[in-house]
UniProtKB/Swiss-Prot annotation:
The lineage of its organism: Eukaryota, Metazoa, Chordata, Craniata, Vertebrata. Disulfide bonds join C31-C41, C35-C47, C49-C67, C73-C86, C80-C95, C97-C118, C169-C182, C176-C191, C193-C212, C218-C231, C225-C240, C242-C260, C482-C507, C499-C509. Residues 27-68, 69-119, 165-213, 214-261 form the EGF-like domain. It comes from Mus musculus. Proteolytically cleaved into 2 subunits, an extracellular alpha subunit and a seven-transmembrane subunit. This is Adhesion G protein-coupled receptor E5. Induction: Up-regulated during lymphocyte activation.
């Protein structure tokens, strides 16, 4: 039977041991690493004292607390019994028999009065009778308890009495002051000061009249605290605390062997590719400020740090705004988080001269209340437990802060919005693709930080309310959103993941970073307008190519005017190709490719306008000043046609660097840059105005010339010629582009369609007016057709009537070809 039962019992024992080991392993994973000495963990955030020790609170939630030994001998109602005394030890106690007594069992000690069997070990010939058995303790103090018990035997009446010393310290017959320690001696007693105490001035140390007072080891220099700690006196002793904001490195907390280190401040280094003198001065100023930091002037340091940031943001940032913002916000939050540890508990607010607002709240980590942090621009409500997280500070406090700067928009105002999480639902709602979105900041950018640095997923939501520009009505394709700035690979973008906004303007988020209220304008793609644009541009490119070939190959029409027409068509042709191929910014990020496309479009379209202006100048010299010279030379025309737009692009780059080129939606000019709109609209408006004036003068002069050439011309034919000429000049001189200056409302569908049709078909209009309506061009086309088909070429006799011939000859001098 033993052979059968033993294996089963062995298996059960093994399983039980493994189960216990697994439980201990699971518990160890959830244990707090910071539990103080003489305590054990009960969770990953709390500890309890071991038996025999106690703390101020039942649960220990930060390492600043400690477990002190319980002196069981002083507990009310405690007694070891007759002929015994209590001896306290660290975490426990024992009861031992008085001198001359021993336990019947022969043991050295016991713990309960019920176990007391103390009996006299010396045979005196009499039966000892207990008399005046007293157990007393020392006066209040931090020294271990000392207890002395005296037993006086009383002989029978017939026996001689043997006198024994009376322990006045135990019997209560002493008159020592409560601040002293009673020491019994043969025939008397002394009253002396304990360790950490001293006689008051004028008092002796020993007599009954001795009165003691606590020794302030901290002020007297008798302490052994490390110079990295601060000595704090206690009754009869002292403790060594870390300086505010400093962290312990080794040793027991608040003990003489505690050593602390200064909190590390972030290194405000420049970006490797940044060469801004403003950034360099800012970095040096902040490094010097933090290097010379004095905890006594923490308020001054915080104010100077905020003012330095304001000074940096007031100057326009040339390049790498998102990279600078990522580094600036990270270092600023870390610095403020560290500086806040030196502040006293409670609220702290500061408003700089540039209206940058900082609000800090410093409270105990074990506070469970819902706390509000606010200033003039922002209001935040959060469960205070999330401020510390798993990070425990030595001083037992944590911080929550909000920083709002109106100038932060200069760095993050052009940051794109990430639509990946919501694109499908938005496209389903609008029924069309949404290639991009435009943003407008309605509130200040608010940077929120806590002592807890792991804020990607909080245990409870944080509620915000921002003071932002009120919106009476939200236009179509617009949405009011609560977004946060997310750093990514040195740059960043706006996102809404984890945040929601209700109708009352409150924003709820389960993570923390920098927040703002944005107005998002979704660019919903119009399939019909996109089709018109692509088909129109393809047709325009074909016609512009035919114009270029015609002006190069048809010899009879080559002149100064056809040279202007040639360069005009070349600029429009190149601009249309670049626009068709690269204008859409599918990725949403403004990179080098998008900026180069925007720059080339800027140059090509400005060059087209300049050649349109030269067309007007040619008409002016041709019609108005026909007898006063031949006009501009070829090199002068090229200098104006290509030099002026190149100069405008160069000036634009010098003013805004590359930031003005490229947009999250299209690779075109970013008109949100202050004044950058006029780098294109200014020259366009000026050229259109000048060409319109030239157009009026030209028509007026042509009317007079037609009357002088043929006074008897019929009014109908005269009106027809003037109408054709007017239409040609209107199209060539770019009035279709001028129509776009009046397209103030981008959501006006019919205006968008008209503008798109006029500009996409401009190549077709130019080909019809400059080539097909020109008789010499038609004759050349007919010759080429006959050469291809092998037919014999004949003159167009049907169109050479008398009036038509005279009209053709009259216009030939002007090379109009019509």
């Amino acid at each position: 039977m033993r052979g059968v039962r033993c294996p089963g019992l062995l298996v059960v024992c093994i399983l039980l041991s493994l189960s216990g080991a697994g439980t201990q392993k699971a518990e160890s994973k959830n244990c707090a690493k910071w539990c103080p000495i003489n305590s054990k963990c009960v969770s990953n955030r709390s500890c309890v004292c071991k038996p025999g020790f106690s703390s101020e609170k039942e649960l220990i939630t930060n390492p600043a607390e400690s477990c002190e030994d319980i002196n069981e001998c002083l507990l009310p109602g405690f007694s070891c019994g007759d002929f015994a005394m209590c001896k306290n030890s660290e975490g426990s106690y024992t009861c031992v028999c008085n001198l001359g007594y021993k336990l019947l069992s022969g043991a050295e000690s016991f713990v309960n009065e019920s176990e007391n069997t103390c009996q006299a070990s010396v045979n005196t010939g009499t039966t000892p009778v207990p008399s005046r058995i007293h157990t007393v303790t020392t006066a209040p103090g931090n020294l271990p308890e000392q207890t002395t018990t005296v037993h006086q035997t009383q002989m029978g009446d017939s026996e001689e009495r043997t006198p024994k010393d009376v322990n006045e310290c135990i019997s209560g017959q002493n008159h020592c002051h409560q601040s002293t320690h009673c020491i019994n001696k043969l025939g008397g007693y002394s009253c002396i000061c304990r360790q950490g105490w001293k006689p008051v001035p004028g008092s002796p140390n020993g007599p009954v009249s001795t009165v003691c007072e606590d020794v302030d080891e901290c002020s007297s220099g008798q302490h052994q605290c490390h110079n990295s700690t601060v000595c704090k006196n206690t009754v009869g002793s002292y403790k060594c605390h870390c300086r505010p904001g400093w962290k312990p490195t080794s040793g027991s907390l608040r003990g003489p062997d505690t050593i602390c280190q200064e909190p590390p401040f972030p290194t405000w280094t420049l970006l490797p590719t940044a060469h801004s003198q403003t950034l360099l001065r800012f970095s040096v100023e902040v490094q010097n400020l933090l290097r010379d930091f004095n905890p006594a002037t923490v308020n001054y340091t915080i104010q100077k740090l905020i003012e330095a940031v304001d000074k940096l943001l007031e100057d326009p940032m040339e390049t790498q705004t998102q990279q600078v913002a990522a580094q600036l916000l990270s270092n600023l939050e870390q610095s403020l988080r560290t500086l806040a540890q030196f502040l006293p508990k409670g609220p702290f607010t500061y408003t700089s001269p540039s209206n940058t607002e900082l609000s800090l709240m410093v409270k105990e980590q074990d506070n469970k209340d819902v706390t509000t942090v606010h200033h003039g621009q922002t209001w935040m409500e959060l469960d205070w437990a999330v401020t510390a997280g798993a990070k425990i500070s030595e001083n037992g406090s944590s911080v929550a802060g909000i920083l709002s700067s109106p100038n932060m928009e200069k760095l993050l105002g052009n940051t794109p919005l990430n639509l990946e999480q919501r694109r499908a639902s938005l496209e389903d709602f609008y029924g069309s693709p949404i290639p991009s979105v435009s943003l407008k900041l309605l509130s200040n950018i608010n940077s929120v930080f806590l002592t807890n640095t792991n804020t990607e997923k909080l245990a409870s939501n944080v509620t915000f309310k921002f003071d932002f520009t009120s919106v009476e009505s939200i236009e179509p394709r617009h949405e009011l959103i609560c977004a946060f700035w997310k750093a990514h690979n040195g740059n960043g973008y706006w996102d809404t993941d984890g945040c929601s906004m209700n109708g009352t303007g409150f924003c709820h988020c389960n993570h923390l970073t920098s927040f703002a209220i944005l107005m998002a304008q979704y660019h919903v793609q119009d399939p019909r307008l996109e089709l018109i644009t692509k088909v129109g541009l393809l047709l325009s490119l074909i016609c512009l190519l035919l114009c270029i070939l015609t002006f190069l190959l048809v010899k009879p029409i080559q002149s100064s005017r056809t040279m202007v027409h040639l360069h005009l068509c070349i600029c429009l042709f190149l601009g249309s190709i670049i626009f068709l191929v690269g204008v859409e910014n599918e990725g949403g990020e403004v990179g080098l490719r998008c900026r180069l496309v925007a720059m080339m479009l800027h140059f090509c379209f400005l060059a087209a306008f300049c050649w349109m202006a030269l067309e007007g100048v040619e008409l002016y010299f041709l019609v108005v000043r026909v007898f006063q010279g031949q006009g501009l030379s070829t090199w002068q025309r090229c200098l104006i046609g290509y030099g002026v737009p190149l100069l405008i692009v160069a000036i634009s780059m010098a003013v805004v660097k590359m930031d003005g080129y490229g947009h999250a939606t299209y690779c075109w000019l970013d008109f949100r840059k202050q004044g950058f709109l006029w780098s294109f609209s200014g020259p366009v408006a000026f050229i259109i105005f000048c060409n319109a004036a030239i157009f009026v003068i030209t028509v007026w002069k042509l009317t007079k010339k037609f009357s002088e050439i043929n006074p008897n011309m019929k009014k109908l034919r005269k009106a027809r010629v003037l109408t054709i000429t007017a239409i040609a000049q209107l199209l060539v001189l770019g009035c279709t582009w001028g129509f776009g200056l009046f397209l103030f409302n981008p959501h006006s569908t019919w205006l968008s369609y008209i503008f798109t049709l006029l500009n996409c078909l401009q190549g077709l209009f130019l080909y019809v007016m400059l080539c097909l309506l020109n008789k010499k061009v038609r004759e050349e086309y007919w010759k080429w057709a006959c050469m291809v088909t092998g037919s014999k070429y004949t003159e167009f006799n049907s169109s050479t009537t008398g009036t038509g011939t005279s009209q053709t000859r009259a216009l030939r001098s002007s090379e109009s070809g019509m």
